[in-house]
Amino acid sequence: MNIKFVVVGKLKEKYFKQGIAEYAKRLSRFCKFSIVEVPDEKAPENLSQAEMDRVMAEEGERILAKIKDREYVYALAILGKERSSEAFAKEIKDLTTYGHSDITFVIGGSLGLTPAVLKRADTQISFGKFTLPHQLMRLVLTEQVYRAFMINEGSPYHK
C-alpha cells in the first residue's frame, strides 16, 4: 500500500518536521509513506478576488500534476465530510480490500483548493470547522493515518 500526501508549501518548523518524521517511521511497517510538496504561489497581502483565483489556479495545477489516475484521492476541505477515527480506519481498510493500493491526501495552501482539485478528489474529508495552518494539518493528518492503521490492527494505541 502507498500513502501519499500532496501538499502546498514547504514545512519550515522543526517541531512539525520531527512529529511527522516520527509518525512516518511508525507508518513504515504498514505502507510506503511519502510527502510531495508543491511550491506555494507567492502572493502579496490583501489580494483581489482575481489574484486569489490566479494563486489557487497555479497551486491547483501543481497539485493535479502530482496525482496519477489510479490514485484514490482525499481532499482536505472544511466543507468535506467529518469522520470519527474509527470510521476513517474502516474506510482505509475497505479501500485496500477493494483494490485501492494508492491513496493520496491533498492539503491545499492558505487559500484552499480549486474546484478542479475538489472535482478530482474521490472524497472530501474535514477535520472540523476550525481553520488550521496547513503545516499543522499535515502533522494531524499523519497521526490520523497512523491511528487508522493501529485501529485496524486492534492495537491499544487508540483508546
From Swiss-Prot:
<protein>
    <recommendedName>
        <fullName>Ribosomal RNA large subunit methyltransferase H</fullName>
        <ecNumber>2.1.1.177</ecNumber>
    </recommendedName>
</protein>
<feature type="binding site">
    <location>
        <position position="108"/>
    </location>
    <ligand>
        <name>S-adenosyl-L-methionine</name>
    </ligand>
</feature>
<dbReference type="Pfam" id="PF02590">
    <property type="entry name" value="SPOUT_MTase"/>
</dbReference>
<comment type="subunit">
    <text>Homodimer.</text>
</comment>
<dbReference type="InterPro" id="IPR029026">
    <property type="entry name" value="tRNA_m1G_MTases_N"/>
</dbReference>
<dbReference type="InterPro" id="IPR029028">
    <property type="entry name" value="Alpha/beta_knot_MTases"/>
</dbReference>
<keyword id="KW-0963">Cytoplasm</keyword>
<keyword id="KW-0949">S-adenosyl-L-methionine</keyword>
<dbReference type="GO" id="GO:0070038">
    <property type="term" value="F:rRNA (pseudouridine-N3-)-methyltransferase activity"/>
</dbReference>
<comment type="similarity">
    <text>Belongs to the RNA methyltransferase RlmH family.</text>
</comment>
<feature type="binding site">
    <location>
        <position position="76"/>
    </location>
    <ligand>
        <name>S-adenosyl-L-methionine</name>
    </ligand>
</feature>
<keyword id="KW-0489">Methyltransferase</keyword>
<keyword id="KW-0808">Transferase</keyword>
<keyword id="KW-0698">rRNA processing</keyword>
<dbReference type="GO" id="GO:0005737">
    <property type="term" value="C:cytoplasm"/>
</dbReference>
<comment type="function">
    <text>Specifically methylates the pseudouridine at position 1915 (m3Psi1915) in 23S rRNA.</text>
</comment>
<dbReference type="InterPro" id="IPR003742">
    <property type="entry name" value="RlmH-like"/>
</dbReference>
